[in-house]
Design a protein with these regions (language model features):
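Active-site donor-nucleotide binding/catalytic segment of nucleotide-sugar enzymes
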Residues: 80-86, 113, 125-197, 248-249, ...
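Active-site and donor-binding regions of nucleotide-sugar-utilizing enzymes
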Residues: 1-97, 216, 231-233
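Histidine-centered metal-binding segments
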Residues: 328-350, 368, 372
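Donor-binding and catalytic core of enzymes assembling or modifying cell-surface/extracellular glycoconjugates
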Residues: 19, 158-252
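Hydrophobic/aromatic hotspots within intrinsically disordered, low-complexity regions
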Residues: 318, 322, 330-331, 347-352, ...
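Structural motif
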Residues: 6-8, 142, 223
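Leloir-type glycosyltransferase catalytic cores
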Residues: 84-132, 258-332
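Basic, mixed-charge low-complexity alpha-helical segments
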Residues: 364-379
Length: 387
């Protein structure tokens, strides 16, 4: 009989998958008897950080000594929830698929909501950011909108999601136009939306790559509007209300259809969605069949607007007075370029402009890759000079 070893789990994919894995790992820590298990965070450990049980088990993939100290004597497991039969047959959620694989279950079981633990600094930073935006936009209620999932790409002037999980640009612009007069609209996106000018009712587009700070903003916002992406999982973990629009994926798999605080608008079901076996086959036939399932007509757009208004209620002017946070002399944000003479901290969450659609400098991962490439070029130049 094979000797039982402690396990090391490699978790890949985006932050949404990480959040959905949390309930299964909580169960594993409670039930398995494995006190020394390891979670290797191939996609980053942002949402294991601060967790009262899981943080001590979680490591970034670049952690010094990871292999010798935490992997060599363990059985290696790479969970892939999309390949669980109950998942691709729409009998369980992403979190439950993780649970089946990580805990070796034969049947689907109910799980608690994911746990995201924000500390005092994170919580107040998010609150302050929301208050600043509300005061500048003169609105008393904030709506955070995440229009895109990870599969969206920019092709020239167009933003395209080949998997049809994100909002179509024209649709989300129309929705924003109907809501911006009532509420403080905050767009959670790495790619810039072509938001029309409106001096009286501006839209905030914070340039903030830190997802934990976005989580703190969602915690302080009055409502969340999104698609099949990380924001809805953050909203669930923080017990917030959400309107979620779904196209090519299926609500039972990727969202929370039994939660009264979630209004799921399933556009894909109305348009004959065909399940796409993500991470199983490379055939694009399903994506082609689903190519138009997120394209909304005016009636669909109005359903989204009405849903947000139902949760938010009547919008008013900002009440009270915003008190800015006193700036510190030391910057601890690893995403900032501290050697830049123009490096400032005046607006911690980026500018609030009429249409802040300037391109970002790149994600943290992209910037690090660029820095590594630059160092490599410098090293090669030094070798050339020596020769």
């Amino acid at each position: 009989m094979k000797k039982s070893r402690s396990k090391a789990f490699f978790i890949s994919g985006g932050a949404g998958r990480v959040i959905c894995s949390i309930p299964a790992f909580e169960k594993y820590a409670e039930e398995s008897g494995d006190k020394d298990f390891t979670i290797v965070c191939e996609g980053g450990m942002d949402f294991y950080r601060g967790h009262p049980i899981l943080q001590k088990h979680a490591y970034e993939v670049w952690h010094k000594g990871l292999f010798d100290q935490h992997l060599r004597n363990k059985d290696i497991v790479s969970p892939e929830p999309y390949r669980i039969n109950e998942y691709f047959n729409q009998k369980c959620s992403l979190a439950q698929a993780f649970d089946i694989e990580i805990n070796g279950l034969e049947e689907v079981r109910e799980l608690s909501a994911p746990t995201i633990t924000l500390n005092k600094t994170e919580t107040i930073t998010g609150y302050q950011a929301l208050q600043e935006i509300k005061s500048q936009l003169n609105k008393d209620k904030a709506l955070i909108i995440q229009p895109f999932g990870r599969t969206v790409t920019q092709m020239g002037e167009y933003l395209i999601d080949s998997s049809s999980r994100s909002f179509e640009v024209g649709n989300i612009i129309n929705i924003i136009e109907q809501l911006r007069e009532k509420y403080a609209i905050i767009v959670m996106a790495e790619l810039a939306l072509p938001i029309p000018d409106n001096e009286k009712h501006k839209v905030a587009v914070p340039r903030e790559p830190n997802l934990r700070l976005w989580a703190s903003m969602i915690k302080s916002a009055e409502h969340f509007l999104g698609c099949d992406s990380v924001g809805q999982h953050i909203a669930k973990a923080l017990d917030k209300t959400a309107t979620v629009v779904i196209g090519s994926t299926v609500p039972i798999n990727i969202s929370y259809p039994d939660d009264d605080k979630f209004d799921i608008i399933d556009i894909g079901a109305d348009k004959g969605r065909n399940y796409a076996p993500i991470r199983m086959t490379m055939d694009d036939e399903k994506d082609r069949q689903n190519d138009e399932v997120m394209m909304m007509n005016e009636e669909d757009e109005q359903r989204v607007v009405d849903s947000c208004i139902k949760f938010l209620g009547k919008g008013k002017e900002f009440q009270g007075q915003f008190t800015p946070t006193q700036q510190q002399n030391v910057c601890t944000n690893p995403d900032h370029n501290h050697s830049d003479p123009n490096h400032t901290h005046n607006v911690p969450f980026g500018s609030i402009a009429n249409t802040d659609t300037s391109p970002k400098e790149g994600t943290r991962k992209e910037r690090r890759a660029a820095e590594r490439a630059e160092r490599k070029d410098q090293k090669l130049n030094l070798l050339d000079n020596k020769e």
